[in-house]
């Protein structure tokens, strides 16, 4: 099952591999085979290192025999026999055993490093062939180190303030519209007050007028007052309320109001009085 799965993944990966990538993978697969001089050692390693073990075992037997003969000759020393020959034989046997053991260990170590390096390359290539066109740095480091990649960080919350509910927005718009209506009422209140003041001033001038000049001024004031009343009659209280409810009143600045009041005939008549 595993072999069939690997073959299927390799077939899928072949579709998105470029020509250069396929060539590199083929060369890497060829390099997995050991050189001829190392193939023999690898074969011996896989077979249990029979030749190395046999050679080391033979040297160990020679060393053990030489050391035992040395102790035997030293215990029952005979006249005319020298102890130099047994000692020399034992020393040479132990030295040969030590040297051959060191060489065998170094050869095995080098062979193991090379085999491990090639196995690591093979594992990485097999991991890349799983259909991944982009490999994250965390995944590669965790794979090479043999650890589990860390969990992704939680998503960041947006820094923008949340939008207010729809009801709150409509209430704010209604408050702004009501405040604008209140502001728009001020010019009309001033106009109504000036209209009432002009009527009162006209009555006073009519009662207190003795000279013909005053009567002429009063008559002219009456004409102007009637003219203003005719102008203001269409804007009575009912129509003003309808205009305010419909929201058709436009804002006027204080400068425009003051200009209109200054240029009005009521202001001119008051100056004459």
Curated annotation (Swiss-Prot):
Annotated localization: Nucleus
GO molecular function, one term: ubiquitin protein ligase binding
This protein's record includes keyword Repeat: no
Segments of skewed composition (Pro residues): 149-165
Record GO biological process: protein stabilization
Record's compositionally biased regions (Polar residues): 170-181, 208-218, 254-267
Residue ranges, annotated region (Disordered): 146-181, 204-230, 251-273
Keywords, sorted A to Z: Nucleus
Annotated tissue distribution: Expressed in a tissue-restricted manner compared to HAPSTR1.
Annotated spans, Nuclear localization signal: 249-273
First-listed, main subcellular location of the protein, grouped into a coarse class: nucleus
GO cellular component: nucleus
Keyword match Repeat: no
Pfam families: TAPR1-like
Signal peptide (residue range): none
Complexes and interactors: Homooligomer. Heterooligomer with HAPSTR1; the interaction is direct and stabilizes HAPSTR1 independently of HUWE1. Interacts with HUWE1.
Functional description taken from the UniProt entry: Together with HAPSTR1 plays a central regulatory role in the cellular response to molecular stressors, such as DNA damage, nutrient scarcity, and protein misfolding. Regulates these multiple stress response signaling pathways by stabilizing HAPSTR1, but also independently of HAPSTR1.
Homology family: Belongs to the HAPSTR1 family.
Protein name: HUWE1-associated protein modifying stress responses 2
Source taxonomy: Eukaryota, Metazoa, Chordata, Craniata, Vertebrata
Designated gene of the protein: HAPSTR2
């Amino acid at each position: 099952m595993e072999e069939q799965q690997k073959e299927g993944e390799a077939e899928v990966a072949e579709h998105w591999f470029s020509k250069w990538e396929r060539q590199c993978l083929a060369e890497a697969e060829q390099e997995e085979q050991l050189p001829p001089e190392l193939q023999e050692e690898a074969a011996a390693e896989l077979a249990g290192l029979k030749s190395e073990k046999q050679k080391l075992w033979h040297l160990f037997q020679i060393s053990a025999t030489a050391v035992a003969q040395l102790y035997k000759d030293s215990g029952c020393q005979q006249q005319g026999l020298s102890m130099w020959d047994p000692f020399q034989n034992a020393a040479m046997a132990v030295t040969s055993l030590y040297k051959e053991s060191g060489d065998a260990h170094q050869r095995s170590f080098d062979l193991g490093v090379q085999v491990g390096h090639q196995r690591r390359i093979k594992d990485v290539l097999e991991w890349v062939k799983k259909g991944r066109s982009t490999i994250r740095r965390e995944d590669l480091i965790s794979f090479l180190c043999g650890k589990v990649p860390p969990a992704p960080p939680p998503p960041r919350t947006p820094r923008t303030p949340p939008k207010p509910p729809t009801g709150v927005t409509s209430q704010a718009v209604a408050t702004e519209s009501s405040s604008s209506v209140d502001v728009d009422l001020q010019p009309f209140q001033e106009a109504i007050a000036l209209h009432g003041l002009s009527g009162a001033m006209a009555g006073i001038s009519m009662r207190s007028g003795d000279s013909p000049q005053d009567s002429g001024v009063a008559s002219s004031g009456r004409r102007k007052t009637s003219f203003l009343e005719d102008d203001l009659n269409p804007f009575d209280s009912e129509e003003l309320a309808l205009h305010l409810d419909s929201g058709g009143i436009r804002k006027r600045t204080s400068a425009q109001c003051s200009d209109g009041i200054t240029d009005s005939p009521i202001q001119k008549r008051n100056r004459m009085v």
